[in-house]
Amino acid sequence: MFSRDMTIAGYDPELAAAIEDERQRQEDHIELIASENYASPRVMEAQGSVLTNKYAEGYPGKRYYGGCEHVDVAEQLAIDRAKQLFGADYANVQPHSGSQANAAVFHALLKPGDTILGMSLDHGGHLTHGAKVNFSGKLFNAVQYGINDDGQIDYDEIQRLATEHQPKMVIGGFSAYSQVVDWARLRQIADSVGAYLVVDMAHIAGLVAAGVYPSPIPHADAVTSTTHKTLRGPRGGIILARSNPDLEKKFQSLVFPGTQGGPLMHAIAGKAVAFKEALEPDFKQYQEQVVANARAMARRVIERGYNVVSGGTDNHLFLMDLTPKNLTGKDADAALGRANITVNKNTVPNDPQSPFVTSGLRIGTPAITTRGFKEAEATRLADWICDVLDNMGDESVVERVRGEVEQICREFPVYG
């Protein structure tokens, strides 16, 4: 029999130390990885609940196991809240991740060997949008589009590629693009060749939910997303769509049993909590601040002489091109890490470096905004980044910036 008094610390001190060290790292470091955020204690409570014990293959009211009456309530709450939050007619909250959601949708709408048209990873896309190392580039004939010399999506190129290759699916969405996507234009292109339009809004789902970034749902046949990142929920995925009974049936069957078995009910409960939090009025204010902070940081690094791809940002992230400074993303990432500023190296368009080295940094503001940073703090942070990059190899600058970072982290704790 288990006791509620059982703890990891009392049984597995090595693991307990790793967890505590990570908690302390999150408090003492500034997090600028665009795909990371801090889940609320309520979300984490749901993920650590007894729902982790329950197997629930199937869907609410149609399970293959007994004893699902309570987890049915949790999943239905998540479904209903997701539909309300995004203005969707259909929601599947079972995908274990964004990639799993994409896999289910792709298998629902495509056959192996079909042509897909997605954004190149090198130009800001995602692995699951047709990268050769991913299932999407192995099972399907992937054609890739990119951005132009101004850092904007080249819609004329997409139309040309669509006309030439006649894809079965056009994919919108990105992992490192800082401008607003014209969903209506992508819909028009897809319609011109009789293709499905699928949008992966994993990075901007929170912005879309709050109405500070255009929603793809009115335009796409299916919309996928993660539930963490800007949504601040648990790690997981979701599929959304407008009313279409035929497609809904395909999506349902391709999530379960097509690509997954039992759903993670503790994670689904965490999604339900996160969607409720996102329906609160202050969530819109949070997302507006996320964008304001990203713009403030981008402006300052440009003022300090750094190149920002596309010249600015209209969402939660921007991409610094370090090529003119003769710096690599790998070296910049490491130097900033020593100053307790966590970023990620990232390829830039036409990057001469390998993906393990890169010529860029991706900067995102969801996590610092959760801490309470506003434009003033974001601007100071941009200055600290530039100070370190301007003085690569000077560890005294790294040490000074680390002290500043530790001080501001104490002023803005994650979990106060």
UniProtKB/Swiss-Prot annotation:
Which top EC class applies here? Answer: transferase
Annotated residues that bind (6S)-5,6,7,8-tetrahydrofolate are located at: 121, 125-127, 354-356
Q: Which InterPro entries match?
A: PyrdxlP-dep_Trfase (IPR015424), PyrdxlP-dep_Trfase_major (IPR015421), PyrdxlP-dep_Trfase_small (IPR015422), Ser_HO-MeTrfase (IPR001085), Ser_HO-MeTrfase-like (IPR049943), Ser_HO-MeTrfase_PLP_BS (IPR019798), SHMT-like_dom (IPR039429)
Q: Which UniProt keywords apply?
A: Amino-acid biosynthesis, Cytoplasm, One-carbon metabolism, Pyridoxal phosphate, Transferase
CDD domains reported in the protein's UniProt record: SHMT
Functional pathway: One-carbon metabolism; tetrahydrofolate interconversion; Amino-acid biosynthesis; glycine biosynthesis; glycine from L-serine: step 1/1
Q: Name one GO biological process term.
A: tetrahydrofolate interconversion
State one molecular function term (GO): pyridoxal phosphate binding
Residues the record marks as site: Plays an important role in substrate specificity: 228
The protein's superkingdom reads Bacteria
Q: Which NCBIfam families match?
A: PRK00011.1 (NF000586)
Protein name, entry field: Serine hydroxymethyltransferase
Read off the lineage from the record: Bacteria, Pseudomonadati, Pseudomonadota, Gammaproteobacteria, Chromatiales
Q: Which gene encodes it?
A: glyA
